[in-house]
Amino acid sequence: MVNYPHQLKGKKANPTPFKTKKSTVDFANRGMSFEAAINATNDYYLSRGIAVIHKKPTPIQIVKVDYPKRSRAKIVEAYFRQASTTDYSGVYKGLYIDFEAKETRQKTAMPMKNFHLHQIEHMASVLDQKGICFVLLHFSTLKETYYLPAKALIDFFQIDKGNKSMPLDYIKKNGYEIIQGAFPQVPYLDIIEQNFLGGDYN
């Protein structure tokens, strides 16, 4: 039985969506990938003392190592291993932040093949410890980005494991659209503040 954080107990994931003026800024038009935009956002938060959130390194399986010199080793063959948890983690206002980021070119749904059981289990464990856990979902063709609480993702995964994709309508109903900005590009802390903490990080 997963005990979700107190911020999510007894309330729908999207009771009063936080709305801001629609921005015309699009990080893709500036030659940035979704991941790069998130990293730039985290750098912005860090440089201003707002939050400390970093991308977790991708685990690597080393297969072959050469030793051209006794004092120097050279990796000549290695493979990326499947990540065991999520993409990002850190601290904001004393709260543990943990999230995954996914992107798709589809217009109506997010492929569930992008999520693995061990990631779902990790998110549930974070919620058990009262952490703030969520996924950032970017629809590149639509140029839309959403914050979906981990609870909503876990519920969908548990109820409809055989479904090949999560409908955009479900994401809109249970999540929050993130309005892209110039600085930061993906202001996801705005969603946390306005909908879960009820404050302002500025």
UniProtKB/Swiss-Prot annotation:
Name used for this protein in its record: Holliday junction resolvase RecU
Species of origin: Streptococcus uberis (strain ATCC BAA-854 / 0140J)
Family listed: Belongs to the RecU family.
Primary role: Endonuclease that resolves Holliday junction intermediates in genetic recombination. Cleaves mobile four-strand junctions by introducing symmetrical nicks in paired strands. Promotes annealing of linear ssDNA with homologous dsDNA. Required for DNA repair, homologous recombination and chromosome segregation.
Binding site for Mg(2+): 85, 87, 100, 119
Site (Transition state stabilizer): 102
Principal place of residence: cytoplasm
CDD domains reported in the protein's UniProt record: RecU-like (cd22354)
NCBIfam families per UniProt: PRK02234.1-1, PRK02234.1-5, recU
GO biological process: chromosome segregation; DNA recombination; DNA repair
Gene Ontology CC terms: cytoplasm
The UniProt record lists the keyword tRNA-binding: no
Cofactor: Mg(2+)
GO terms for MF: endonuclease activity; magnesium ion binding; nucleic acid binding
SUPFAM superfamilies: Restriction endonuclease-like
Comment on bound cofactor: Binds 1 Mg(2+) ion per subunit.
Record localization: Cytoplasm
